[in-house]
Amino acid sequence: MDSSFPDWNIEFREQNESYFMESSSCDMSLAMSLLSIIIAIIGLTGNVIVLQLLGFHMHRNAFSVYIFNLSGANFLFLCTHIVFSLENLIRQFHYIDIHMALFSVNVTILAYLAGVSMITAISVEYWLSVLWPTWYHAQRPKHTSTVICTLLWVFSLLLTLWNWIICKVLDYIYNWDMCWKLALIIVVWLLVLFVVLSRSNQALLFRVFCGSQQTPVTRLLVTIMLTALVVLICGFGIGICFFYWKKEENSIMPCGYFYETILLLSGVNSCANPIICLFVGSIKHCQFQCGTLRLILQRAIQESPEEEDEEVEEVVEQEGGEEDEESTTL
């Protein structure tokens, strides 16, 4: 009897198991890429609606300015998110030995940094409004939100341009040390943002449930808390991925097999805010109530307690009626 037969049988079984694992991994990667594209399309639609309503159909306040800029950052991020998901999807059928588009990478970095900065600024500002309500409503400069959003966009843009110049224009190979230090600076900035975001939300929770002077729960507070929770759970992975990508000298597939998961979570992070606004704005007295998208968004960013809802709805309906009359006249 040929003694090599058992070895051949074992080798054949190992090859079958390897093929099955590779096939299952490919199917999972394909499904996650398709799911990422679907999530990105939903997120783009939601953020466009928020941008349109806050930009042209609603009066802005301090927090709506932040939410408007957050939606803008999420919109930019999701645009490049679709590019990366499509690229990953194509690789399932045909290997392409190209790096991700330079423009898309830089826009992703800019949008991601700006988005995390905006939600942190929203959380800190709400915490300040709860901690010092008299100063906030009486002495706070009128255009503080606009100034802060502008500074955050500029700072995010400077970090992105610095990354592009040092790691691409001046050649990554000859400036590896500088590029690595820049990646470290970006990650440290992200860590600062996430620490401030988590601590400010913890302080808000403590003030609401355990403080001597309990703060009333408003829809805006719920919107901020839920959005911050999604960012902390789903948004931190792509920052780690960026750091790892720099460490591995700009590999084509950053973070290896976790790339699809991180891509999916980052898409969820960027499309969560419109869905949260829709969810929070649709609840009234613990029941779902329908209404126009404008009214739902107005409820979601309402600073006053739920008991004062009727006044807000009357104002929104009057404004909507005035706009309808103007459009009819035109």
From Swiss-Prot:
It comes from the Eukaryota. It is found in: Membrane. Residues 302-330 are annotated as: Disordered. Residues 304-330 have a biased composition (Acidic residues). Its main location: membrane. The chain crosses the membrane at residues 34-54, 63-83, 102-122, 147-167, 178-198, 220-240, 261-281. The keyword Isomerase does not apply. Keywords: G-protein coupled receptor, Glycoprotein, Membrane, Receptor, Transducer, Transmembrane, Transmembrane helix. One of its GO terms (molecular function) is G protein-coupled receptor activity. Residues 1-33, 84-101, 168-177, 241-260 are extracellular. The keyword tRNA processing does not apply. Glycans are attached at N16. Residues 55-62, 123-146, 199-219, 282-330 are cytoplasmic. GO terms for cellular component: membrane. It is a multi-pass membrane protein. Belongs to the G-protein coupled receptor 1 family. Mas subfamily. Orphan receptor. Probably involved in the function of nociceptive neurons. May regulate nociceptor function and/or development, including the sensation or modulation of pain. This is Mas-related G-protein coupled receptor member B8. It comes from Mus musculus (Mouse).
